[in-house]
């Protein structure tokens, strides 16, 4: 089969299924996975699909500003997987930061049932509410002008308060993870400034990113891979992603 014919067939498959895996395409067309990755990159450069780790999807490339609550039910299995990994990392007497993200809400839902004595700093109102009946968890809510769409304050006052904390571990959601240029991004300017401030005030930084965040960019950068110690995701990344992260000494947890 000629390359052009294979590319057409790949497009037919992805238009039907909305998502394809490199492994499956390699077996179907009896070519190497490396060849399929080149095919997917060709199609991506033509604007016909978007690569993800392990395959490709038909999806726009920009992360967009959406209600936090609406994201809670997207990829719940992946978010819960990440949340369980996070709770395993949190230790007795840790001071942690959970920023505004649907994954942070999943983390809080698990943490509230543990016996760990910890301090949780957050700017997400629903995270605070999760700990109402958890006497072992001290909760500090960052104040400021409340963003109703996101569900918490993200402005100058919130940023100023974060500068006063000594955080052991920060768990930060990312709207996009760009492995080609090694940066993290988000879709709200003020929130991106806040995330950057958290990175500067934490001893260990953990980025939370499920499968859809790879090869996807928000409008505003908030950090580089070199600012991060760990990236927690819901599936094992492919070699390309792992190599980009390992080059910047980021440890991948999945």
What are these language model-derived features?
Residues 59-61, 101, 142, 174-175:
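Generic beta-structure capping elements
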Residues 2-5, 9-23, 28, 34-100, ...:
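HTH-adjacent hinge/linker in prokaryotic transcriptional regulators
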Residues 105:
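Glycine-rich SAM-binding Motif I of class I
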């Amino acid at each position: 089969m000629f390359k052009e014919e294979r590319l057409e067939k790949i497009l037919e498959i992805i238009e039907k299924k909305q998502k394809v895996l490199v492994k499956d395409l390699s077996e179907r067309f009896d070519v190497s996975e490396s060849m399929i990755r080149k095919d997917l990159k060709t199609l991506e450069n033509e604007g016909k699909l978007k690569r993800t780790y392990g395959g490709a999807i038909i999806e726009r490339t920009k992360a967009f500003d959406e209600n936090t609550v609406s994201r809670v039910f997207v990829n719940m299995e992946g978010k819960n997987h990440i949340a369980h990994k996070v709770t395993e990392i949190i230790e007795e007497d840790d001071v942690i930061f959970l920023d505004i993200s649907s994954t942070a809400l999943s983390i809080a839902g698990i943490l509230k049932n543990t016996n760990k004595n910890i301090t949780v700093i957050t700017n997400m109102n629903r995270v605070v509410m999760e700990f109402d009946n958890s006497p072992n968890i001290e909760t500090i809510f960052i104040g400021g002008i409340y963003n109703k769409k996101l569900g918490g304050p993200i402005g100058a006052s919130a940023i100023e308060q974060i500068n006063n904390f000594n955080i052991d571990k920060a768990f930060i959601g990312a709207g996009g993870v760009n492995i080609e240029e090694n940066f993290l991004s988000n879709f709200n300017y003020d929130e991106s400034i806040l995330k950057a401030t958290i990175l500067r005030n934490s001893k260990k930084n953990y980025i939370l990113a499920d499968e859809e965040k790879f090869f996807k960019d928000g409008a505003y950068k908030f950090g580089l891979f070199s600012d991060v110690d760990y990236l927690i995701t819901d599936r094992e990344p492919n070699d390309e992603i792992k190599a980009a992260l390992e080059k910047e000494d980021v440890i991948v947890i999945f």
